[in-house]
Structures are given as C-alpha cells and as structure tokens.
Amino acid sequence: LLHRNLIASLTASLFCIPVAHASSDDSCNPPAALRQNAYSCGGMPILSPANDTRINAMLLMVDSGQLAQLFPDPKTIPPKDRVNRIVVPFSYDFSGWIDIGQKQPDTTGNASNANAPSNQYADGEGSICRSMTAGADAFGAALNAAKDLPGDEAARLRAARADIAQKTCASGGASAAWTKPSVKSPIGQQFATYLDGTNAFYRFDFPAATKAFAGASHSANPWLKETGLYMAGRAQLNAAQANAFDHDSPTPSRESVAKVSLDAANTVFRTYLKVYPQGRYAGSASGLLRRVAWLGGNVAQQADLYDKAFAHWSPTVSNVPLMQLANELDSKLVFAPGFDPRQIQSPAVLATVDLMRMRTSDSTDSSRDKPLTLGELQAQKPRFAGTPALYDYLLATWYVYVGHKPAAALDLLPQASGAPLDYFGLSQQALRAFALEDSGQPDKARQLWRDLIPLAKLRFQREALELALAINLEQAGLVDEAFADDSPIQNAAIRATLLQRAANADLLRAQAQNKSTSGTLRDIALYTLLYKEFTRAHYADFVTDVTLVSDAPSDALKPFAQPGAKNEDGYVCPSARDIAAALQQNPADAKGMNCLADFVRRHPAESGLGEYSLPSWAAAGAPPASAAHVPPTLGSAPSQFKGKSFERMPGYVAVMDDAQANPNDRAYALYRAIKCYAPSGYNDCGGKDVPKNTRKRWFNTLKAAYPGSQWAQTLKYYW
C-alpha cells in the first residue's frame, strides 16, 4: 500500500515525479506534460486517457468547486521549495493524500479520517464489530432523549448494551450467554426488543436480529423507528453474504449469496432512504446499497449508485472519504472480474471506462486489453442522450488520442466562453489546444493557452495551463517568451526546467542578472550558463561571465569560485577561470583538458542539466508506429545552447595521444581513463566504449612508460 508522504528529489520533482501505483509499492515517473497517451501515475486536472480511472471519476462526477477544495493549494508549498515542484502532474495516493510538496496539515479531528464513525462502511459491511462502539454511544444518547423512560430502566438498558459488547465482540466473549434486561414500561420494552436484535446481530443470528429490529422499527420513538429499520437492512445484508466469501477472498461467490436476503436488504435500504432521505444513516445505507448491487452482480445498478454517490458526495454526510469512494469504484466495478461495460447506463461511469480504453497500450497496462473502437463509441450515443457535451468530448478525445484526426475533434469542441472554467470546461479547451497543435496550428494553440490562463480559478488549473503553454513555446523555439515581463508562466519549477534544458546563453545571462526574479532562479540561470559554457568550449564567455558569481555564492556556484588546488590523487589544477583561459588560448592544452575533466568528475552537472536523451528509434531515423504520436514533454526539445557537451573519456584519449604533452599529464590521463571503468567494468566517462584489451594496454603503458609517477605506483588493477 502507498505511504502517505511521497518525497521527491529536486530533479525528480521537476521532471519525473516518483509516485506509487495505487495497488503496489512500485514507483513510476510521469512525464512533465499535460498531454499523455499511456497510463500515468501522475494526475492531471483534465479528463485524460492517461489519468488513473479514480482521478477521472472524480473530475467527471464531483462538483468542481467541491473537488477543488480537496486538492491541496499550491500556495501552501513553502516558497523555498517552489522551484522544485512543478505541481501538475501531481502525485497522489488513495489514502486520500495528494502530494505537491505542500505543508502537511494537522489531521487531528479531520473529517476525512477513515476511522471516523461516518466512514465505518467504506468498503461495505466488513466486520460487524466495527460499529459496536459507535452503536453503543448512539444507544446511550437515545436513552437519554427518550421520554417516559424511568431512570432505573435506562440504567439497566445501558448496562445490558455494554454487556452485549463484552459477550460478543470482546475477545473470547462470543459464547457467553446474555440476559435480556427486565423492564416494565412500554418504551423500555421497545428498547429491550432492540437489544434483542443487537445481541442476535453481533452473534451472527441474522434471522433473529431481523425480526427484533423490525419489531423495534414500529416504535413511536423516533430513534428506535429509524435505527430499527436501518439495522433490519444490515441484518439482511449480512445474512445474504454470510457464505459468499471463501478463504478471505475479496471476490464473492455469487452462487453462494442468499438472494432472498439480498433482495430484502435492497428493499429495506431503499425504503429507509425514501422515508429518511437526510437520515442519520443515509450515507451508510447508500453505501450498503452499492454493496447489495455488487453482491448481486448488477453492474447497471452499481454504476447508477456510484454516479449518485459521487455527485452528492459531501465530507459531512457521505459514508466514505471521496478517494475511498474512488477506490471502491475501481475495485468493485471497473476492475471487478467479468466486468462488462455494455451494461452501464450511467454516462459518467461509462465515460470513465471509455477514457481508460483510449490509452496507448504498454506492457504493464492491463486496462487496455480491449481498446475502444470508433464503432463502439458511436453505438453508445443513446446512453449519452442526456449529456451530449460529454459524448462530444469523448468522441473528440478518440479522434485526438486514437484516430489522429484533429480536424474532426475541432468540429466537436466548443469555443471558450470567457467565463471561469470548471474542470470539464478546462478539459474541453485543453483538448481543443491539443487538436490545434496536432493539425499544424501551434500558434493558434499557443494563443488559446494564453487566453485560458486568466479563466483558471480552481486549483491546479493554472499550473496545468502554464505547463502546456511552456511546452508549446519550447517546441516552437520561443523560450524567451516564457521569461518576458508579461509572461503568464510564473511557476518557478517550469521556469527552472526551461532554463536548465532549453535556454540559450543570452537568455541565461539575462536571467542570471534579472533582479525581478527570485534569487534561486538567478542562481539556476547562472549555474546553467557557467556549466554549459565551461563544458561546451565557450571559454571566452566563461571567463567573462564567471565574474557574475558573488562573493558569497550558493553551494552550486562555489566550484566556479574556488582557487586552484591539489586533488585527492595529487594532481594540481588551477581555478576554473584559469582552466578556461588556458583552453581559450589552446583548446588542446593537455593540463587544461585534464583539469576540465577533473572539474566534471568532481562536480558533475546537476541532474536537471542533462541533455534530453532521444529514444533509440529517434537516433535511427523514423519512429515506429507506436511512437509516432508521442506528445512532447517539458524540456524535451533540443537545447538552444550551442555546442556539444564535454565528455571525459575523449579528453583523456586526446591527452594520451598528444606527443607534446607533459609526461605527468599523460600519465594522469592514462590513470583516469583506466579508472573510468572502476569498479563495475562499465564506462562512466562518456564517449565510445573502450575494449578491455585496450584498457589492458593502457595499464601496461602507464606502468612501463611512467614507472616513477605516483599514479603508476598506486594503480593496482585495470577493469
């Protein structure tokens, strides 16, 4: 199961948020993109095939304003952490926690606590003893409120209720006999009858419990009347499922479900909800009705009940937290054995399943066994008669994600109205922008992304739109626009990604000196500028720009300001500035090459600076069919910073091959090139792989040609 807190490293937070699948501890890395084709463990605030079905279900069926309040507020991310948190896609687990790096709330007394009495039937009836304590409290309160009940009888009834708990649910107590209290008043006898039912219920004598609770439900006392009816339904439900589960299996054997009792439970709970639509047990009765439908294999009824449960969900009234309800939808319906979506009549639940079936398949995604065809979707149209906009959205989604006919999608999607967007409205407009980009109109999509940002009023909407706009600008080679004074892209993590991955030297230099931005982003810009200049042979620019490092630099910038020194192997290098100056004069300078390699070895680039690695098919030429429509991610466009990144191994080889090089420098280059393979036997210095016989020759050369060098004397092996 998932842990509550998912702490990401800086780079992972920016580019690929590690989160866990809902059903395992395996982590995954969702791309930094609003548009994704395959299943993603990162959630997005738009209806998407890539979303977990539980996220889509909430977006489809829960009021947007209410759902937004359950999402964490990006403003609660501590300012110092915002450069590390891209927010969307957001990581989540289904204990109810969505992690964007926000401050953790005090959960004391939290209404979403899964142990609260109102949440005790989150997964159906479960252990009947779960309701023992809450039931005793409610019974005591009812005794206190009962008129015409003598005090001594109330005391005996209260003691008898406590005795039931001790002799049924307490360890070793189920075999002990219970004595019905002796009371004479009519109201006292009615409460005693209720206790008869309680005792039978907790002893699993459900027929006797049903009879007693039904009798109590005829009382004039409001509590007995309502609670007796509700408990009669629970007794019948437990009777129905008594033999339905074998060996702790979560799946019922429907042949073993007592249908008469199940039908009775269905009738009682529906009667209860009709008589007490706002009753004290209305949330629980609704949840148990879902269990009745599940036990009976009634998919259409299940879907209808889930639709209502999501639509009317409330933290104070519903019997389960919203994300537990989403879990229940998944386990009891969408991924239940033998599930047949053709039986679903609920448009929202059907849409949840349809979106899942539009995913791009991968080897780990079992949800894509039966991809949705256009014919199937068109045949569903009558079931969406009451929700034509949702049907058009699904059809447009199919054309964008599956059929790759963006023009057909554009014909189905509305223009933005200019009003604030709910999550469905955001989904429609985002899909329009995707279709525009796919149809060769990225400029129109870019303007749409810009126009939508002021309409984003709900949590995660603005972050999603800023991400989409940033990707569009990056793909168009317009990264500078993301940093313009009037740019709507304000997310610090998005800006950091663009600086590290995409920006050219001029933009980095400008942002490194931009006093209107945060000190953290200025440091990222300057670090990226200096590291790329130093390692991409922009030596003259480096010598000039290194003067921008302050007298009290951040940790990342300190290596650029350090004086020369002897390293741990005894090799002496000057400062970074002096190394660059030497290489500016002679790019093949042996000591300069060795010292540049040593700088890279001792101060590897921050992970965010890593060049985007193309998939193997991209290097070979045309992509395979499965990769033809892979959407871009933030930081995936070729960097606008000119030059090829320095690699240590080719540098060492160049020094080895330089007949004019100082013997000390050649010996050190040999030593370091050999150690590139230590201790794994794999090259961690870049460049082409070197055969083992060549490494052996290097080792022998070091020993034979430079026997007096400290490196020849200390190196014992080659790898």
Task: Locate each region found by the language model.
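Bacterial N-terminal signal peptides that target proteins for export
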Residues: 1-8
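Bacterial N-terminal signal peptides
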Residues: 8-17
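Alpha-helical solenoid repeat scaffolds
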Residues: 21-210, 219-719
